[in-house]
Amino acid sequence: MTTDTLPVLAILGGTGDLGTGLARRWAQAGYRVIIGSRTADKAEAAVADLREVMAERGVAAVAVEAMENQAAAEAADIITLTVPFSHQASTLEQLKPALQGKILIDVTVPLVPPRVARVQLPEQGSAGQIAQEILGEEVAVVSAFQNVAAHHLQEGAGLDCDVLVCGNKKEARAEVIKLVEAAGMRGFHAGMINNAAAAEALTSVLITINKQYSCHAGIRITGLDHAE
């Protein structure tokens, strides 16, 4: 499968650790990836860094480019939002027209500093539900990747980590699971967007575990032997 037959991916807020980690993995898997940022300079710097990392890994060419968030959202088929919770709603309100008819992967975790190790879900239930309410039913919001350490994503090694994928449209969840697998992990249909609350809450639990045991913990789904 070539970049001509794969969906075009955009990562909004793609200059942070999580965004660059996903960009590296998807670009290496052969996807055309657009790194979006509020400023073109930051996006271009992230692209330059990604190309340098790919060269170090022996990957000769990758289809990656830099754009401001608006242009990135317009150009892509599937958009991933990796901005902090404090910027989620305003970013989605601004980009709502450009996202209509597309899949939005919402990676947002409603962390409230300084107590990020404490579960503090919003009144709406979850960040995923907030995204769906803002964008409307013409946008397939899919919640995923909340429980993956950015540190692991940026490395080139395999990932012993699973991803819970929540969204109201099964077909959209299936598309996101393909991207999870392209990034080197297992993805699981985890139900409607309301269930995103579970994955989002788990992040604070994992932060607590990471601090306690000096690790980068993830989650693993067990008991699947009978299905293989």
Residue positions per predicted region:
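Active-site-lining helix/loop region of Rossmann-like oxidoreductase modules
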Residues: 162-228
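NAD(P)+-binding Rossmann beta1-loop-alpha1 motif at the extreme N-terminus of oxidoreductases
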Residues: 2-52
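General beta-strand structural signal in soluble alpha/beta enzymes
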Residues: 66, 140-144, 188-190
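Hydrophobic Val/Ile/Leu positions in short beta-strands of Rossmann-like dinucleotide-binding domains
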Residues: 11-12, 81, 165
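Phosphate-coordination loops involved in phosphoryl transfer and adenosine-cofactor binding
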Residues: 5-8, 101, 160
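Rossmann-like NAD(P)-binding element
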Residues: 57-103, 110-115
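Rossmann-fold NAD(P)-binding glycine/threonine-rich loop
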Residues: 108-155
